[in-house]
């Protein structure tokens, strides 16, 4: 697996199947997005790419932990620091410059609440509008649910905060572990 922490150094000539988001904790909802890009990549001989925005210290998982978890599952993991340049980039520019010109996206899988670009102006409606123009297939994946509540990193953090590791593991879909001194 290629592990990229500097987006300017990533290059591919291959068509890609991309999923984008924070991917904090790599919970069951994230796992479904990843399975969708894997399926497309296998069927269409494309490169599978997880594009994760690095949100800093508040994250459940570091980039290195994501790398260890995804090793052997996807072709490329991009950890994109949430810099001012990324934060200020207009949504249309993100689609054109990042998804199309740099990633060569042929397929994009995102959750129903995915937003991107300056002031979160980009959303699934915008991705749908641009799909035909740029020739990518878009799949919107419904949120995973547990006990009638959407699985999210916030839900996992809440469970861990009150010591409910068992619930956190059900939401994650794997055993939770932490390292420290």
Where are these regions (language model features)?
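Nucleotidyltransferase catalytic core that binds NTPs
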Residues: 1-181
């Amino acid at each position: 697996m290629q592990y990229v922490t500097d987006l300017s150094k990533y290059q591919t000539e291959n068509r890609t199947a991309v999923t984008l988001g924070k991917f904090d904790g790599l919970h069951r909802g994230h796992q479904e997005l990843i399975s969708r890009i894997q399926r497309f990549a296998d069927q269409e001989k494309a490169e599978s790419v997880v594009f994760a925005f690095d949100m800093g210290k508040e994250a459940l998982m570091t980039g290195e932990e994501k790398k260890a978890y995804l090793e052997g599952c996807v072709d490329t993991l991009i950890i994109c620091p949430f810099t001012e340049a990324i934060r200020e980039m207009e949504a249309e520019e993100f689609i054109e410059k990042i998804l199309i010109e740099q990633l060569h996206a042929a397929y994009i899988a995102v959750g129903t609440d995915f937003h991107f670009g300056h002031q979160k102006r980009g959303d699934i409606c915008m991705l749908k509008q641009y799909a035909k123009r740029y020739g990518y297939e878009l799949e919107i994946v419904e949120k995973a649910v547990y006990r009638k509540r959407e699985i999210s990193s916030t839900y996992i953090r809440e469970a861990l905060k009150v010591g409910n590791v068992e619930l956190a593991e059900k939401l994650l879909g794997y055993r939770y572990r932490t390292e420290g001194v």
